[in-house]
């Protein structure tokens, strides 16, 4: 699927310049870059949460797009009811709660959860529905290593089962190495380099990419 280019400007200053790209169903695209590089702005524009400068459609045709923000604000009802907002398949809901280790929280008010618990609930909710494109913004940032690994396995499973192009915003280069098929590197609001994971993480062409990877120890 073709994603058209777009920009985002705040107070006359361009903070994002995305030239567009092709997304392939069944692949995971990790979006990396330093803080303030435009990763979350890219995710929000792509998901339609904030408006890009250019009016029109992002895709060459109609696709369903899902989005999980970096910080979720659940409704003041039970965890299982929050998850059910994503879909009505009770068996699927229970399977996801079990895998994400939140079954014991099913009846608890979702607005009383910890950050990590809220993130797992939000993941379960978004995984209830099949999307053509799913955008996850730092979904495992509040999780420990074990739960992050479980969540990563679910991302890969969801992507393959649904034929979904999954766009993962992450601050963790190790996570990008583990789950991504392709990597997008943003630098000061620009998509500096994109390609296969092996190319971007181990043989980058752009000097900004090389400096970033050297600094963060890949």
What residue ranges belong to the model's regions?
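Conserved catalytic motifs of ABC-family nucleotide-binding domains
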Residues: 71-87
């Amino acid at each position: 699927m073709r994603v058209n280019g777009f920009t985002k400007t705040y107070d006359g200053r361009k903070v994002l310049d995305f030239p567009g790209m092709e997304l392939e169903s069944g692949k995971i695209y990790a979006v990396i870059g330093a803080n303030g590089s435009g990763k979350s702005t890219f995710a929000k524009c792509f998901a339609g949460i904030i408006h890009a400068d250019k009016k029109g459609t992002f895709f060459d045709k109609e696709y369903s797009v899902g989005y999980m923000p970096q910080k979720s604000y659940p409704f003041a009802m039970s965890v299982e009811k929050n998850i059910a907002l994503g879909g009505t398949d009770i068996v699927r809901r229970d399977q996801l709660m079990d895998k994400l280790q939140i079954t014991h929280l099913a009846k608890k008010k979702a607005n009383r959860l910890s950050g990590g618990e809220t993130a797992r609930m939000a993941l379960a909710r978004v995984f209830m529905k099949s999307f053509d494109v799913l955008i996850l913004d730092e979904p495992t940032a509040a999780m420990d290593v074990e739960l992050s690994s479980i969540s990563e396995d679910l991302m890969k499973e969801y992507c393959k089962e649904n034929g979904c192009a999954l766009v993962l915003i992450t601050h963790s280069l190790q996570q990008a190495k583990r789950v991504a098929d392709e990597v997008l590197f943003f630098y000061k609001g620009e998509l500096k380099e994109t390609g296969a994971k092996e190319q971007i993480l181990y043989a980058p062409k752009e000097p900004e990419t090389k400096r970033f990877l050297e600094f963060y120890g890949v």
